[in-house]
């Protein structure tokens, strides 16, 4: 299966498919960003194992939901051939909805151009591992045009043997700022243990910002000096 999200360099059409031939009555709603980092939404109907193309160019995929649960995995991806409903080029996959689930929020999110986000808390839950092991969660931020930086590292011990771990870290006294066009990402790593299931939830305060273009009138130096001279005569 795919492990990382590879961003497109420019907006492109998305495709959807299922790994089960019987998934033909469900629809896939995709929320993401276009080349201008504006929010766009598109709904595409599934046709089982066959890939179905959308009509809008997506630069980013932030959220995917289904109209009803499916019997197979649902893939959202850029152009790729498929085999039994699975994209042949997994680097094109932007999101996967697991069998029986209704949604798939990636552990990565690009902020729209007219928004600022403030991370106030994170909650993590894990279970299903066969042995105890250390878990490390890393929260990274990538500013527009810059490299990724790690803002917070969370370490805890999963006890394994079907134990359930539930923890929360609060940033409400000093929220972490994610400006427009920046990327929020969570990565998880572990030492030992197998078959762990990890859930992660981030809480944000959203701030709308004004992105209306403004016009500035510029005059040359000679005209500016003449205008100042005229003002001087008027004042005298």
Enumerate the predicted regions with their spans.
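Beta-strand-centric surfaces of beta-sandwich/beta-rich domains
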Residues: 1-60, 67-235
């Amino acid at each position: 299966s795919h492990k990382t999200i590879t961003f497109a360099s420019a907006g492109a059409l998305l495709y959807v498919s299922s790994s089960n031939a019987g998934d033909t009555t469900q629809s896939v709603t995709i929320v993401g960003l276009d080349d201008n980092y504006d929010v766009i939404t598109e709904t595409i109907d599934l046709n089982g194992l066959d890939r179905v193309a959308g009509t809008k160019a997506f630069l980013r995929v932030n959220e995917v939901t289904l109209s009803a649960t499916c019997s197979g995995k649902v893939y959202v991806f850029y152009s790729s051939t498929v085999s039994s409903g699975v994209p042949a080029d997994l680097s094109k996959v932007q999101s996967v909805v697991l069998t029986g689930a209704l949604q798939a929020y990636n552990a990565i999110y690009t902020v729209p151009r007219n928004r600022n986000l403030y991370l106030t808390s994170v909650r993590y839950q894990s279970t299903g591992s066969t042995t105890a092991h250390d878990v490390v969660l890393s929260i990274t931020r990538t500013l527009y045009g810059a490299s990724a930086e790690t803002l917070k590292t969370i370490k805890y011990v999963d006890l394994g043997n079907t134990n359930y771990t539930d923890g929360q870290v609060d940033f409400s006294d000093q929220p972490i700022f994610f400006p427009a066009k920046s990327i929020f990402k969570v990565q998880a790593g572990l030492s030992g243990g197998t078959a762990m299931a990890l859930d992660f939830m981030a809480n944000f305060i959203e701030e709308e910002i004004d992105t209306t273009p403004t016009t500035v009138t510029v005059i040359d130096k000679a005209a500016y000096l003449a205008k100042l001279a005229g003002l001087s005569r008027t004042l005298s």
